[in-house]
Amino acid sequence: LCAGQTGAGKSVFMNGLICSLLYRFTPDELRMILVDPKFIEFRSYQDIPHLLLPVVDDPNQAKVALKWAVREMERRYRILAKIGARNLASFNQKVEEMGAAVIRDILVSEDTGEEMPSSVQSAGHDWMEAFEPDEAGVPRIGKLPYIVIIIDELADLMMVAKKDVEISIARIAQKARAAGIHLVVATQRPSTDVVTGLIKANLPSRVSFQLASFVDSKTILDKSGAERLLGQGDMLFIPPGSSQPSRLHGAYVDDEEIGKITAFVKSQGKPTYRNEILLDDEADEDEFESDADPKFDEAVSLVRNAGHASASFIQRHLKVGYNRAARMIEDMESRGIVGPADGARPREVLLR
């Protein structure tokens, strides 16, 4: 959680943070979602290969992206549980060391002892489909990258969709770390209607630049001090597990340096955008009644031809939101078109 008034150095700090990540991680190791309601702060990073999405400047799209991050967090925890890993680093190490043997162990059925054929894919844009069957119905897995979500101005998001944004941020902050998903939230208006108690309680790591008043400092740090900082990168930092702030000075990164860094990174490869992240389930719900989805017949035809079924498979091919695709799968199961979920195995298609 980062706060600072205009000119205090907050934006320079965010740029320094992003550049440090670009120096340390390849796109296979780290993917980012940058939310920039002010349109100008993160423009320099457009089209770098680390991005999951083009820089998000629409608060409604940011709300949908945060909901996706919650679903991805839950999906990753299911994968970590199957493989017996406590965190993402342990998971990636197991995949690297054991390869296909890991998949074979995971896909052995406890009931029948039968093994499913498996394939291991390298890290990259296919990581979003880990444990999903490919076109041939073969489950696959690969290394999972870290995901960092950076929000430049929280106030704009809270004005548009306060409840959804607050819940998503709280859920990601309180349990996504072990799944490799991290969140940086910044604001220049640290009032209690923007930085709510729920958000603050779940973001224990705080950075405060110069603030206008004691009240603002109390909101961010739970103590005074930020109102007496000097500006231009002078900050107080409270790490997780500590109640005492440390006084630091942020690194200065100018526009020319950012331009050189991003130009080099862009020369190494193009981004693989996953625009299905922004498919809005609420918009889908406005278009149809739950018992009469106009794309249901198309989805049935798709899974019959493929011979396997999953919500992610329908989402990718029909370009619908995840929740809508999941409802179609549940409807198919209730009608006897597909079988029940069976751990890592793809659902069996009963209708031929």
Predicted regions and their residues:
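P-loop NTPase catalytic phosphate-binding loop
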Residues: 1-122, 129, 137-211, 215-229, ...
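Conserved alpha/beta core segments of nucleic-acid transaction machinery
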Residues: 136-138, 239-352
